[in-house]
Amino acid sequence: MRIIPAIDIIEGKCVRLSKGDYATKKIYNEDPLEVAKSFEAHGIEYLHLVDLDGAKSSHIVNHKILETIANKTSLKIDFGGGLKTDKDLQIAFESGASQITGGSIAVKNSDVFQNWIQKFGNKKIILGADAKDRKIAVSGWLEDSNEEIIPFIQNYEEKGVKYVICTDISKDGMLEGPSFELYKEILSETKNINLIASGGISEFDELPKLAELGCEGVIIGKAIYENRISLKQFENYILNQ
């Protein structure tokens, strides 16, 4: 199972939110590159980079930070937040993203999202399925949709989606443990999805449980920044896989 630390960006700084609420913003580091380099120094190969300014304004904003991290580390970066147009994707990929995550766009403009899958391939386009009470939330989680999470993912699997990041918003940033039951259900109701668990990771012992369920990756944010899990623990986990 891949270990994927998260860096969320607001105004160029590394922050975390609780349950996606921008009012709960806490700045952890002024320099996202420094954070990314510390991940790489501990054997981590992947990074989930979220442009929260972009998510709010519905277009790419913090691509210069993406470019800096891509140029100065070897991390494979999945970039998301406010990606709405082919131009946004072009900027993201040219700035060094290995993959992009589309969330709101997959709900609000499925034709565009499907076109991205055709154009760039399903290894580069990740479906962001962010759920609040089992309904998909959009626009930086500021709006709810009527899309139920399981049919939503099943529908996109039929359309060729391979990678899905699923965040249970009620868990995100709360350090109360992930949504094991939800992930178990998604994996039992889909055929070949590479499911990346996100939200609520609070301690190291949760990782083997997610791997056992069949999650292909796990995104960890606040547990790192609040020192609940050390980078050394990740390093050992990666070495022993």
UniProtKB/Swiss-Prot annotation:
Its EC number is 5.3.1.16. The active site is at D8, D130. GO terms for cellular component: cytoplasm. GO terms for biological process: L-histidine biosynthetic process; L-tryptophan biosynthetic process. The keyword ATP-binding does not apply. InterPro entries: Aldolase_TIM, His_biosynth, HisA_bact_arch, Isoase_HisA-like, Isoase_HisA-like_bact, RibuloseP-bd_barrel. Pathway: Amino-acid biosynthesis; L-histidine biosynthesis; L-histidine from 5-phospho-alpha-D-ribose 1-diphosphate: step 4/9. GO terms for molecular function: 1-(5-phosphoribosyl)-5-[(5-phosphoribosylamino)methylideneamino]imidazole-4-carboxamide isomerase activity. It is found in: Cytoplasm. It catalyses: 1-(5-phospho-beta-D-ribosyl)-5-[(5-phospho-beta-D-ribosylamino)methylideneamino]imidazole-4-carboxamide = 5-[(5-phospho-1-deoxy-D-ribulos-1-ylimino)methylamino]-1-(5-phospho-beta-D-ribosyl)imidazole-4-carboxamide. Keywords: Amino-acid biosynthesis, Cytoplasm, Histidine biosynthesis, Isomerase. Pfam families: His_biosynth. The keyword Isomerase applies. It is an enzyme of class 5 (isomerase). NCBIfam families: 1-(5-phosphoribosyl)-5-[(5-phosphoribosylamino)methylideneamino]imidazole-4-carboxamide isomerase. Belongs to the HisA/HisF family. This is 1-(5-phosphoribosyl)-5-[(5-phosphoribosylamino)methylideneamino] imidazole-4-carboxamide isomerase. It comes from Christiangramia forsetii (strain DSM 17595 / CGMCC 1.15422 / KT0803). The gene is hisA.
